[in-house]
C-alpha cells in the first residue's frame, strides 16, 4: 500500500511512490541528535516542510531513531549546504553516545558524502541491514562554520529513492484532523483533496 498527500498526476502513478517509514518527517517531531537535543528549526519552510538548520554545528546531526528489520533500505532528504567541511549522510547509531540504551542495527554503510549545493537538492543513500536493530538516519558536517539546511526525510524499502511523502501514520492522523475540522465547521467541504494510491506491495 502507498498512501501520500500529493497531486493527482503523482497519485495515479502507482509505480513510483513507496511509503515513508519515518513518522513526522514534515513536522520533525521526535527528531534528536546524539546528545538528546532537539533540532534547531529554520524560520522558512521548503515545499511546505519544516527545515532543520544545522548551521555552525559540527557532528550534531538530528534525525529519527528507528528500529528496522533485515533488508535493503534507501534514505533520502533535501539539503542546501555551504562551507568547507565534509557533509555526510550517516545511518548507524553514534557509537558511545546514542547507542547506550538501544540495540544497534548492523548496516553495511557507515557514511556517504554529499556535495555542497547552493540550491535545494535531494540526496539519497541505499544501505543493507544484516541484523535488526536501531538506526539514526541523519546528515552530519565535519566543519564548525558550515551551513546545513535539511528537510523532507524519507526512509523506504528497496534500493530506489522515490519522491517524498508522509508516512501512512501521518496521513491517518491528518485525515482524523480533517474530519474534526469538517465537524467543527458543520460539514463544510474543504477546498482541497487528498489523493491516495494502493498496490499489493508489503510495507511493513
Residue ranges and their predicted role:
Residues 27, 55-89, 123-128, 152-153:
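Extra-cytoplasmic beta-strand recognition segments
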Residues 36-58:
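Short carbohydrate-recognition loop motifs
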Residues 92-100:
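Short edge-strand/loop segments of extracellular domains
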Residues 1-30, 140-202:
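Extracellular polysaccharide-targeting segments
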Residues 82, 128-132, 142-144:
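Short, surface-exposed loop/turn segments at beta-strand-coil junctions that are enriched for proline
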Residues 75-77, 133-141, 153:
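Extracellular beta-strand-rich recognition modules
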